[in-house]
Amino acid sequence: MRKPSSGQPAGLDAWDETRSLATHAGPDFALYVGDSLDCLAKLPDESINTVVTSPPYWAVRDYEHDEQLGLEDEVDDYVERLVKIFREVYRVLATDGSAWLNIGDSYFNKQITVGGKPPRTGWKRNKQLSLVPFRVALALQDDGWWIRNVAVWHKPNAMPASVRDRLTVTWEPVFLLTKSERYYFNLDEIRVPHQTSDAIERRRAESGTVTGKAQGKKELRKWLNSPRHRATIEGIKEVERRPNAPAAVELASYLRTALKEKKRSIAWVAEQLDLPFERTRHYFRTDEIGSRLPPPEVWEQLKDLLELDATYDEAMTVEVGDNVFRNHPNGKNPGDLLSIPTAPSGANHFAVMPRKLAHFALKATLPMNGSCLDPFMGSGTTGRVVRELGGRFVGVDVNEHYMTDYLVESGVISPETETLW
């Protein structure tokens, strides 16, 4: 059950028009067969809330159609063609809309030609990683899109590569694109549970030994007065502060002067404190990037070792107090690493988007009764998830055969004959 959100469904007033122009249509879907650019031109302006799509990758697979994307001789032509398609996507997308774009990469090899010949010069050479996803992303950025995220789709069940001179590729980028700075994004729909308490609470709560039970107000007061026990209360942590601490650069200059007077080196200090040199030297660095304040225990050791005066005693005094940290009740931001297994190839399509990936994207960017577009719908995974979430789906594909499963499920095609009614 999805929670209501502030997002407004786009294209409701033009939904009948969108369906009437489609090759196949139902109450909650409109499917167009043909070239993406031509089909998108039929859709009304700002009639789509979100886009979830994975276009054919460049030079990876032939889907047996002359007009398909991905068969271009030059990678630059592929990028240019995809940018043109996404200009139409930009037009049909609502002002507060967004687009999730998944593209895989490919390597130049002896089978890939550039201008009809095997690549031999420049960067387009055998065994070179094409970096197609990022070339597309930069081109889209130059064309006016906001790039809000590059999510990593990690494939835990990725097939191992047979190559011996590079790593197996186990991930693909998923770009989150928007038309403007402000857009619909329902983070609460995709939050994940808080798995552990933060380090401060855990360290405080697990230290020491507790005996007996807190009974009555007097014992309860003693229990609350114990920092260790107080830290076990959700949201309350004991923290250390230096409210009057000097700038790290200022203190470093003071320490360097004392070190010079002692005629000692930073290496000597590190040895005396039994600390790594790389850590110790930061306390003596006078540049803002590398300078660090020593922690309380190290500061006390430095005072004794270098025979420091009381100049910074008050400034370096540590105060201990309670801070209240409250985790978001709905969970935490899931982050941009999505570990989702690949989906098995379907009977009618090789590269099937995992339902879990489409579900994640749509939960965040598809409002209730909103509309979603997939200009490269393939077998229709995105459309199925849109239906599950109560949305409206607009799908486009150059090959009608790939739509078979979706059309059977929608009652447009007889499962026995697989012919159009």
Swiss-Prot record:
It is an enzyme of class 2 (transferase). InterPro entries: DNA_methylase_N4/N6, MeTrfase_CN4_CS, RM_Methyltransferase, SAM-dependent_MTases_sf. It comes from the Bacteria. It catalyses: a 2'-deoxycytidine in DNA + S-adenosyl-L-methionine = an N(4)-methyl-2'-deoxycytidine in DNA + S-adenosyl-L-homocysteine + H(+). One of its GO terms (molecular function) is N-methyltransferase activity. One of its GO terms (biological process) is methylation. Its EC number is 2.1.1.113. Keywords: DNA-binding, Methyltransferase, Restriction system, S-adenosyl-L-methionine, Transferase. Belongs to the N(4)/N(6)-methyltransferase family. N(4) subfamily. A beta subtype methylase, recognizes the double-stranded sequence 5'-GGCCNNNNNGGCC-3', methylates C-? on both strands, and protects the DNA from cleavage by the SfiI endonuclease. This is Type II methyltransferase M.SfiI. The lineage of its organism: Bacteria, Bacillati, Actinomycetota, Actinomycetes, Kitasatosporales.
